[in-house]
Structures are given as structure tokens and as C-alpha cells.
């Protein structure tokens, strides 16, 4: 099989997401004290926090087993998505880009968790006293990837409906 005709060439996007995330986290850890916050806009701070759980600090208050669980989960999901990329055609650009972003984000957070025992988060959006959960570049990559997959699914559904009519 010619691998250039699969979704695997899109893995460069995973590498960009992975390294962008790790570089930004390194900059935060080197230049901020824990919980230090710098106001950027009236609704946005850079705030260094440590997330021992998953999205929205899910399971953060447990005894430490969740670190290994989330690392294994990220690896398993990444390998599954890698298989999807292998099976996809290179022409499935939206889906392949979404998958690649999700792999890069998942592996970046897993690497952070394996190295530190937690994930470094720093994007802090808020309105008055309400704060959205703090997140990082890897989280953005995962969410954009999931959004691209949703858009692709709707587009595929529209194509099927138009063929039936």
C-alpha cells in the first residue's frame, strides 16, 4: 500500500500541535510561579495551574491512579485514531486533519502527565467572577479536531441525503 495515499501524511499536524503545546507549557513553567496570573485582556489571563485530572479537572481529587489511567487512555485512543488515519484516503482532508489534531493534543497532554504527574494549563478566560476552566494548546487541538470531525460528519450526511433525493 502506498502510505502517501492514506491519512498518515497528516501526522505532521500532530507534530505541530504536540511541539507547540510542549513549548508553550515550558514557557509558562519557566516564567510563572504556580497560580501566578497575568492579565492580557479584560476577559483573559495567562494563569499557571496544574491539572491532576482530565478535562475540567475530572478525577483530579483522587489518589494518583488517574495519572496512569489518563496516560494509557491517551495512548490507546491515539493508536486507534492512527489506525483510522491509516485506513483513510488522503483526500479525506477534513477528517484527517481532525484526527491528526486529536493525536497531537492527546499525546502532548500524556507526555506532560508522564513527565510532571499533571498537565500544565494556562489559558484563563473569564467574565466578571465566572472563570471557564483553564486549558492549554493541546486541549485546543483536541477540541478543534473534534469539531472538524463533527463538521465532516454533517457534510457526509448531507452528501448521502442529496444522493438519495
UniProtKB/Swiss-Prot annotation:
TM regions (residue ranges): 9-29, 65-85, 97-119, 134-154
GO CC annotations, alphabetized: plasma membrane
EC number: 3.4.23.36
Reaction(s) this enzyme catalyzes, per UniProt: Release of signal peptides from bacterial membrane prolipoproteins. Hydrolyzes -Xaa-Yaa-Zaa-|-(S,diacylglyceryl)Cys-, in which Xaa is hydrophobic (preferably Leu), and Yaa (Ala or Ser) and Zaa (Gly or Ala) have small, neutral side chains
Active site, per annotation: 121, 139
InterPro entries tied to this protein: Peptidase_A8
Membrane topology reported for the UniProt record: Multi-pass membrane protein
Domain of life the protein comes from: Bacteria
Enzyme category, top tier: hydrolase
Biological process according to GO: proteolysis
Role this protein plays: This protein specifically catalyzes the removal of signal peptides from prolipoproteins.
Keywords: Aspartyl protease, Cell inner membrane, Cell membrane, Hydrolase, Membrane, Protease, Transmembrane, Transmembrane helix
Name under which the protein is recorded: Lipoprotein signal peptidase
One function term, GO molecular function aspect: aspartic-type endopeptidase activity
The organism's taxonomic lineage, starting at the top: Bacteria, Pseudomonadati, Pseudomonadota, Gammaproteobacteria, Pasteurellales
Principal subcellular localisation of the protein: membrane
A Pfam family: Peptidase_A8
Pathway(s) the chain acts in: Protein modification; lipoprotein biosynthesis (signal peptide cleavage)
Compartments it resides in: Cell inner membrane
Family to which this protein belongs: Belongs to the peptidase A8 family.
Amino acid at each position: 500500500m502506498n502510505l502517501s495515499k492514506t491519512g498518515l501524511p497528516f501526522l505532521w499536524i500532530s507534530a505541530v500541535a504536540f511541539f507547540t503545546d510542549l513549548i508553550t507549557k515550558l514557557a509558562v513553567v519557566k516564567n510563572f510561579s504556580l497560580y501566578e496570573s497575568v492579565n492580557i485582556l479584560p476577559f483573559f489571563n495567562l494563569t499557571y495551574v496544574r491539572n491532576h485530572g482530565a478535562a475540567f479537572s475530572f478525577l483530579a481529587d483522587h489518589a494518583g491512579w488517574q495519572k496512569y489511567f489518563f496516560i494509557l487512555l491517551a495512548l490507546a485512543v491515539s493508536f486507534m485514531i492512527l489506525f483510522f488515519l491509516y485506513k483513510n484516503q488522503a483526500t479525506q482532508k477534513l477528517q484527517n486533519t481532525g484526527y491528526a489534531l486529536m493525536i497531537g493534543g492527546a499525546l502532548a497532554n500524556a507526555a506532560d502527565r508522564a513527565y510532571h504527574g499533571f498537565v500544565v494549563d494556562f489559558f484563563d478566560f473569564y467574565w466578571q467572577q465566572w472563570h471557564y476552566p483553564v486549558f492549554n494548546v493541546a486541549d485546543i487541538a483536541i477540541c478543534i479536531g473534534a469539531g472538524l470531525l463533527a463538521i465532516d460528519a454533517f457534510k457526509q450526511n448531507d452528501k448521502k441525503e442529496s444522493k438519495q433525493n
